[in-house]
């Protein structure tokens, strides 16, 4: 019987959860779910100078917001240092690693010699077979792995295929420093083995590490997990992803008003696809996702595509769910604090009532919040440039007779208001747009908004008439 699939996401807490890391987490999560397995979380916090608790919290928060739940407690790599030392010492005892007493001066000499000979710098193995009794007094050694010198190390990769590394290029690298702390290369292998990880899905920049890690697995006689190294994300112009392309933290995407489900949908298609399907539910992603279908080539990040997908998700969202998502993100978006303060019971009811019209015109929650500002605007309304041009003398003249028409409407519903304005337009020989445009400007201070009859209903009779009255004098 085959082992249950266990994947892991192993970020370093030196900053936010960036978009590449979020995609890696998503792929690990989906594959674990697809196989009925588990995704574990390990915080690779061995770099004590750069690792921070705030960064760890930001990563956990980002994963939670994205809906990527992990199994069990998050594991701290730093706290496992005694186990890493134990395995390094075991490798020495078994003749698979050795103590190296080479001084910094000797190592620099090796580097200089390699440079002079046009070779990449490599440790020359001078302590590989020496008797430790020859060790200089008072020098704390490092532990180096005894890497094979002949042949090649092959990484069997589900995405990249078999990748071969000549062993002459892989020197006896350090697994334990002289202060007793493990190197990243060593700690990762010990942790993945002890956690029972069966499948490693990570960025292609780790492919060279995979060769060295395979050497440690083989030295310990452990099974090597199935590796999948995914190509990095590039910008739309094909260059390496940078902040201008979208290499931001997940928290930034949240503050820009993207929905987690939409971001998941966009990220899953960066390097993986299922036929021509663009929009897919989480259940479909889980059913369809397989590492063998991940593309070798680099994916390109496209903000416009993300916006389009987010807009689709917003339009298909339940009004209450979208309202809740907006309220949750208000503290983080520009102008959101003022909007949040205006949300008393009446304001909440108005915003929910406006949601069907607002979501049709917004691609992000930020745009949704901006579109909703008219509800809470103070009188007299500040007019934007286009609204002011619509409320010129001609616009006000068109609007003046509309006031008594609206005042006389019995039932304040979109249908009744529509019928009354259309009848007035017909009687005056005007097209509906000729009335709707200055009316919208008077009600919202803008030239664009949800449907003008929906706006009248959301504002209510009293506020609507008052705003029109402000403009016609």
Curated annotation (Swiss-Prot):
Q: Where does ATP bind?
A: 243
Which spans does this entry mark as compositional bias, Basic and acidic residues? 113-133
Relate the protein's function as given in its record.
Catalyzes the attachment of glutamate to tRNA(Glu) in a two-step reaction: glutamate is first activated by ATP to form Glu-AMP and then transferred to the acceptor end of tRNA(Glu).
Query: Which positions does the motif 'HIGH' region occupy?
Result: 11-21
Identify the main location: cytoplasm
Name the EC number(s). Answer: 6.1.1.17
The protein's UniProt keywords, in alphabetical order, are: Aminoacyl-tRNA synthetase, ATP-binding, Cytoplasm, Ligase, Nucleotide-binding, Protein biosynthesis
Subunit structure comment from the entry? Monomer.
Q: Name one Pfam family in it.
A: Anticodon_2
User: Which positions carry the signal peptide feature in this UniProt record?
Assistant: none
One term under GO cellular component:
cytosol
- Residue window of motif 'KMSKS' region: 240-244
User: Hey, which family's this protein in?
Assistant: Belongs to the class-I aminoacyl-tRNA synthetase family. Glutamate--tRNA ligase type 1 subfamily.
Segments carrying the region annotation (Disordered) are 113-136
Swiss-Prot/TrEMBL GO biological process terms: glutamyl-tRNA aminoacylation
Q: Does the keyword Protein transport apply?
A: no
List, alphabetically, the InterPro entries matched: aa-tRNA-synth_I_cd-bd, aa-tRNA-synth_I_codon-bd_sub2, aa-tRNA-synth_I_CS, aa_tRNA-synth_I_cd-bd_sf, Glu-tRNA-ligase_bac/mito, Glu/Gln-tRNA-synth, Glu/Gln-tRNA-synth_Ib_cat-dom, GluQ/Sye
HAMAP family, sorted: Glu_tRNA_synth_type1
Q: What is the name attached to this protein's record?
A: Glutamate--tRNA ligase 2
List, alphabetically, the PROSITE patterns matched.
AA_TRNA_LIGASE_I
The record's subcellular locations are:
Cytoplasm
Q: Which reaction does it catalyse?
A: tRNA(Glu) + L-glutamate + ATP = L-glutamyl-tRNA(Glu) + AMP + diphosphate
Main EC class of this protein?
Answer: ligase
GO molecular function terms noted in the UniProt entry: ATP binding; glutamate-tRNA ligase activity; tRNA binding; zinc ion binding
NCBIfam families per the record? gltX_bact
